[in-house]
Amino acid sequence: MNFVTTLTYLLPHRMLSSLARHVAYCQHPLIKQWLIDTVIAKFDVNLSEAAEPDAHAYPSFNAFFTRSLKTGIRLPDPNPDTLLMPADGRISQLGPIREGRIFQAKGQSFTATELLGDTAAAAAFTNGLFATVYLSPRDYHRVHMPCTGQLLKTVHVPGRLFSVGPDAVRQIPRLFARNERLACHFDTAFGPMVLVMVGALLVSGVETVWGGVEIPAYGDRITHKDYQGRNIAIERFAEMARFNYGSTVIVLLPPNVFTLAPHLTAESPVTLGQALAHRLSLNHSTQAPTQEK
């Protein structure tokens, strides 16, 4: 484990993230502009794709970070049987959920039950598929629906706020099952689907289109919110949630319904709306994709 990763164990995660939250919403022109300009330069942010390409037009760093894209700059795969990539970013890992376990990195895994904080819900994804997408600070930070879904419930699982960068993913055991996260459960035409919004160091919040800010500043217990009967349906490719700083979204899919797009591997750069998975025909046998070992 390198020095930086070791240091993340010792850092006051909550205090730093609380400070980041306040700074992100600061509208002092010198402070917010310095932050925006620094991130653009350090991470090579492409503002030409943004609905507002003028870096000075954003009232706060958070407004810049959660910026919208120009209409038409991302388009959904036209095949209705294709599951869409939910975000811009890079594939951290993807593949089958073997015996209830989700692959994180070489020698690292965690269970779907640990991730979701719900044994019964996790059972629906045994031998299913997962895809973990990392959103770096340069990326578009809104998460969209892979397919049309009816919101059933959300589960906020409190936890640590480790970095979710590539080094941390390789070196911190069960990282995504330890960090604070919001699991959003949907009913879809092909069965259950969960999108897990994973918090991280300096992430100042997760917002959903139906509930606003969903991750409390100091949550200390698992919180369930039941949305059945509320008729909250979100269309394929529509915005579902957003990160107020870079982090990770994990998609869980049930077994025997989809096959992952064959060109996708760990570290593949991805864009919102491209194919994540293709629906299997009724007479198609499921073949598990290969994972990094």
UniProtKB/Swiss-Prot annotation:
Any one biological process term the GO annotation gives? phosphatidylethanolamine biosynthetic process
Q: Name one Pfam family in it.
A: PS_Dcarbxylase
Q: Which GO terms describe its cellular component?
A: plasma membrane
- The record's principal subcellular location, in a coarse class, is membrane
| Annotated positions of the Pyruvic acid (Ser) modification | S247
- Disulfide bond in keyword set: no
Q: Which domain of life is it from?
A: Bacteria
- Site (Cleavage (non-hydrolytic)) location in chain: G246, S247
What does the record say about PTM?
Answer: Is synthesized initially as an inactive proenzyme. Formation of the active enzyme involves a self-maturation process in which the active site pyruvoyl group is generated from an internal serine residue via an autocatalytic post-translational modification. Two non-identical subunits are generated from the proenzyme in this reaction, and the pyruvate is formed at the N-terminus of the alpha chain, which is derived from the carboxyl end of the proenzyme.
Indicate how the chain sits in the lipid bilayer: Peripheral membrane protein
The biological pathway it contributes to is: Phospholipid metabolism; phosphatidylethanolamine biosynthesis; phosphatidylethanolamine from CDP-diacylglycerol: step 2/2
EC code(s) of this entry? 4.1.1.65
UniProt subcellular location: Cell membrane
Reaction equation(s) it catalyzes: a 1,2-diacyl-sn-glycero-3-phospho-L-serine + H(+) = a 1,2-diacyl-sn-glycero-3-phosphoethanolamine + CO2
The record's InterPro entries line, in alphabetical order, gives: PS_Dcarbxylase, PSD-B, PSD_type1_pro
Relay the cofactor remark from the entry: Binds 1 pyruvoyl group covalently per subunit.
Answer yes or no on keyword Cell membrane.
yes
MF-aspect GO terms? phosphatidylserine decarboxylase activity
Q: Which family does it belong to?
A: Belongs to the phosphatidylserine decarboxylase family. PSD-B subfamily. Prokaryotic type I sub-subfamily.
Whom does it interact with, and what assembly results? Heterodimer of a large membrane-associated beta subunit and a small pyruvoyl-containing alpha subunit.
Primary role: Catalyzes the formation of phosphatidylethanolamine (PtdEtn) from phosphatidylserine (PtdSer).
From the Swiss-Prot or TrEMBL record, give the protein name: Phosphatidylserine decarboxylase proenzyme
